[in-house]
Structure formats: structure tokens, C-alpha cells
Amino acid sequence: FFQAEDGIRDTSVTGVQTCALPIYSQMHPKKGLRHSPISGVVLTNGDVDHVAGLLTLRERQNLSVYAHSRVHSVLKENSIFNVLNSDYVDRREMKMNVEFELKNKEGKGSGIFVEAFEVPGKIALWLEDESKGANFGTQEGDTIGLKISSASNEKSFYYIPACAKMTSELSEKLKDSELVLFDGTLWKNDEMASSKVGEKTGQRMGHMNNSGPDGSIEAFKDLNVKKKIFIHINTTNPILLSDSSERKIVEENNWEVSYDGMEITI
């Protein structure tokens, strides 16, 4: 979340490494060369593409970082994250299934409320330990989703950038919701191998595929979600191509494909 000109009330749901780039006018410095309007960050897992951008948010600007205790412990154990000077950066633990208001370093409320919850997934790639069996040492809190609401609770949406499967508990949570931003990593489970860019399947990486009977398109069919948008999309995924047959299938099933700078109103 970041400081808009008329208050701390805006959210960006891109990866932290993207948030740190000056691609949106709202994120440009407002008070000098080193000012950052970014007031805080919420982490949903410890993967590199979710935490690496923290290293660019270290220019002695006040910041609050929210995460599960599991992810905070990972950051604490890796000394490179000590560049986040504790004089300026508050590391705040998120309790699961408890709604709270996002606040800046000084404790000023943002008017944005978040409820974090666990979703099926796995440990961050760089923390995997093959000696610990099929789950590679996955622990509680390694993968979470967020429900993000306005202060009045009149509007809310879900942000789930990684999800290994749709459970009955998760489908019940998402049912009849206004907006869901969901893991769109791969079209097919074996996409990395068939594209000759890697060997791991989507399931091995902790991601549902979009297509097929066990895919996210099928999983959402009866959930009556008003607006569904794929995020966290791998470069191999053909839904990125506006003229592909896969994109056509996505759109026929009332899904949208996210893009840089996308703005959504609910």
C-alpha cells in the first residue's frame, strides 16, 4: 500500500520487485530524491519474486512489512535482508484468519483491511530440502492468500498469487465474491517441459494449471465470482497472447488476463 496524494488508501497487488519500479505515477517520489510513497508491503510467501524487491526499499524511508511468522523467520535468517534498517522498517507478523488494518511505520491507519489465510502450496524454491521428503520441508505459512477490504467492508477482493489446488474450504471462501486475483502461472501442468525451458511441472512448483479438469478455470465454474483475473503468469503461458486459442478459452469462461499497470474498480 502506498501514500496517495489524498491519503494512505491505495493498494498495488504486484510483486514487490515491480512495486519498487517507478512505472506508476502514484509511486514517484513526492518529497525529495529519496522519498518513497510506498508505506508498507504484505508478503504472501518467501519466493524470490516476492521478497527480492524489499532490497530496493532500503533508502532510509519508513516502511512496514507484514508477513506470516514463517516468512519473517526466513528473512531474519538471511543477513542480506539486514539492509532493511530496523530504525525505519517495522516487521509485523500476520495472524491467520484475523482481519486487521494495514498501518504505516508511524501507526497511521490506511483504511485498508486484510485477512490472511493459508492456501495449498509449498516452501519457497530456494529453501527446498529434498532430504525432508515429498513436501521439501514445507511448513505452515509458506503460502497464503489475502482478503483485502475497504474500511466500511462494503467492498473486498481476494489476492492469491500461488495455489496448488482448490480445496472445498477455499472454494467456499471465494464463492459469490466480487473479485478474485488468482494464480495463473501455467496453462498446462507440463508446460515448462513442453516449452523446453525447464523440467518441473506446475504441481511440483506449487501451482494449479489454468486448463483441464483439475485446473482453475474448471474449479471456478460454479463459484459465481463476479470478476476473475489471472495474475502471476509465466512467460510460457499462451494466455498472454491476445490472439491465442488459449486466451479465447479464458475469455469465454469470463476470465481476464492481467497486465502491467492494470487498474480495477469494484
Kindly label every feature range from the protein language model:
Residues 63-72, 181-183, 230-231:
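Short internal beta-strands
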Residues 141-143, 151-156, 164-262:
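Cap/insert and terminal regions of metallo-dependent hydrolase folds
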Residues 37-49, 68-144, 151, 255-260, 264:
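Metallo-beta-lactamase
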Residues 1-19:
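Single conserved hydrophobic/aromatic residue that forms the stacking wall/gate
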Residues 51-58, 216-217:
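Histidine-anchored nucleotide/phosphate-binding helix
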Residues 12, 16, 46, 119-123, ...:
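Active-site metal-binding loops of divalent metal-dependent hydrolases
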Residues 39-40, 60-64, 156-157, 227:
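Short active-site oxyanion
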